[in-house]
Amino acid sequence: PNHTVEQILSQPLKLYFNLSGDELKKNIIDLLKKVRLGEFYMSRYPRQLSGGEKQRVAVARAFAAKPDIILCDEVTSALDVSVQAAVLNLLQQLKEDLGTTYVFVSHDLAVVRAISDRVAVLYQGRLCEIGPSQNVYKFPSHPYTEVLLGAVLEPDPDIKPKLVAEDIVEEKPPEKGCSFQGRCPRKIGDICNSEVPPWQIGENGNAIRCHINIEELASLQQ
């Protein structure tokens, strides 16, 4: 908080590329331009920036090292909807311009759908389903993914989700079996409690861990 934007952006440039002087300043200005901030932001402190501007500076700092992969952990949380959209558009544009891969972590399903090419769904820290983004959203295969998407508010409040999880609070994942066993509405028996589900790949390209055959799950969801 006691560093200016110039000082914040100069650190990775010095560390990774040993830049200094005019060359350092030029690279800082270029980074600010990439995230659509003017040169005059160099002298500003974080306390003088809005939430969206702070996120843009954070994005610029991440790109300063010219990484192949960037971990984006809840980058749009605590931002209002319009600022979220601006940050997502910026990240999308930078991805197209620079060819960078994002590992995008978020609890916001709409944000994940907007930014991702592939989606990995986790429950209690364990993978449940992986697949192309559009397939996971349109044709969820794992019971937890189905419950998760069914919990999203619909424009029509009379529309009820097809599948609802058991209302049980789990403080930690089970030691054995499926991580979703305590809340799964499609639980089939003791095997769910005792054995880790195998991976299965469906015709839609989604991979899931479940004891129920993936094609049988698809028929249950119709």
Indicate where each model-derived feature is located.
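Q-loop/switch helix immediately C-terminal to the Walker
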Residues: 1-14
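Conserved ABC ATPase "signature" region
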Residues: 22-40, 149
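Conserved ABC ATPase signature
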Residues: 45-49, 53
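Hydrophobic anchor residue at the start of the ABC signature
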Residues: 59, 71, 87
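A short, proline-enriched helix->beta-strand linker immediately N-terminal to the Walker B motif
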Residues: 64-68
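P-loop NTP-binding/switch modules centered on Walker-like glycine-rich loops
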Residues: 75, 79, 83-158
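Short catalytic/signature loops enriched in Gly
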Residues: 132-222
